[in-house]
């Protein structure tokens, strides 16, 4: 089972937040908390709060055991950008974009769940490509 927590419009660029997200994916929650506490990045603070929220969601709402939980997925997508102007030389100006992120952390208690999801995705891709190849073969037959 998967439990998750979301946080929208966090004032940090998604590129910087993804660096910290990559550190904790696949780790047990205790290890992930230690990594985030010792990471000197602004995103680590936001992800720590979000991880604690996801842990409480998993234990209270879904009845999962805290000992088995691990970080199934951590995503930092782009949120809305604020555009500001900054004065430049000779009376001109340029635009500053202050980016924000939408953060999502998913926790799971089943270690095989990630493998199952990957195999399902691979099967879907195979079906789609096989269907595409069959359509191309039909088009070639019609042309001949």
Swiss-Prot record:
Pfam families found in the cross-reference section: Ribosomal_L22 (PF00237)
Keyword tags: Ribonucleoprotein, Ribosomal protein, RNA-binding, rRNA-binding
One annotated Gene Ontology cellular component of this protein: cytosolic large ribosomal subunit
Gene Ontology molecular function terms on file: rRNA binding; structural constituent of ribosome
Record flagged with keyword Ribosomal protein: yes
Protein name, per record: Large ribosomal subunit protein uL22
Start and end residues of each stretch annotated as Disordered: 123-144
NCBIfam families xrefs: rplV_bact
């Amino acid at each position: 089972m998967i439990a998750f927590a979301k946080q929208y419009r966090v004032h940090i660029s998604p590129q910087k937040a993804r660096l910290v997200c990559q550190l904790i994916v696949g780790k047990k929650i205790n290890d992930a908390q230690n990594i985030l506490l010792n990471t000197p990045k602004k995103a680590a603070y936001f992800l720590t709060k979000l991880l604690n929220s996801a842990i409480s969601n998993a234990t209270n709402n879904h009845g999962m055991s805290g000992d088995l939980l691990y970080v199934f997925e951590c995503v930092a997508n782009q949120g809305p950008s604020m555009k500001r102007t900054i004065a430049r030389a000779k009376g001109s100006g340029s635009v500053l974009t202050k980016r924000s992120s939408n953060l999502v952390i998913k926790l799971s208690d089943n270690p095989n769940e990630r493998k199952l999801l990957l195999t399902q995705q691979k099967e879907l891709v195979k079906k789609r490509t096989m269907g595409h190849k069959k359509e191309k073969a039909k088009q070639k037959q019609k042309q001949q």
